[in-house]
Amino acid sequence: MINGQDKGNKQMTFSILAQDLNTGAFGGAAATGSLCVGGWVLRGDSRFGLSASQGAAPSTMWGEDALLRMQAGDSAEQALAAVIGQDAGRDWRQLALLDRAGRTACHTGTKNTEWRGALLAPGLVVSGNLLAGPQVLKALRDTFLTATGDLAERLLASITAAEAAGGDTRGLQSAALLVVSDDAPPLTLRVDWSENPISALRDLHSRSQSGAYAAWLPTVPTRNDPERGHD
């Protein structure tokens, strides 16, 4: 468990999981008032979908096991039911899922601090707890649906809007972005601590899209081009 600072050592988070209907790519973004949100929350595989495991006592095993269930053919709802199972601590946890077919599911335990909840739509799920109010999730969802640019840019716009809408009641300390696709290398960006983590994440994303790093990316193997290399 990470140190949640002044709120009883609770990790509270808002996150978004989404599918790009044009490219088939999956992406997620998250921010929290504690450390290392990327390592705790976001997991994904372009073949199976995404998970976001968060809450007062987040279970990384839930996120990992849900992906395995979706790999085996479970829908998001089936995977959710299976991993929650008989976990006696489930009321302290929150888990959002997005499967390969764009189906979504979310569990929000009742012992997570208000405001807590989720909004679900085909190919999109936003969730959070210890938020300023429901307007945070509405900003996440609505901004993603109206934003322009590629999947990463839309996700960054969404968490920026969520922060402006009130975000996490403690203020934010870390932020992360994950995009997985059969046609591109994974994009995994994390700001594990910053006074302005979303701004820092946006800067890191800009750096990843330019210069020597961006020039190197087309040489890396992908699911659809596994033998790619340097000419």
Model-derived regions: residue spans:
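N-terminal nucleophile
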Residues: 2, 8-231
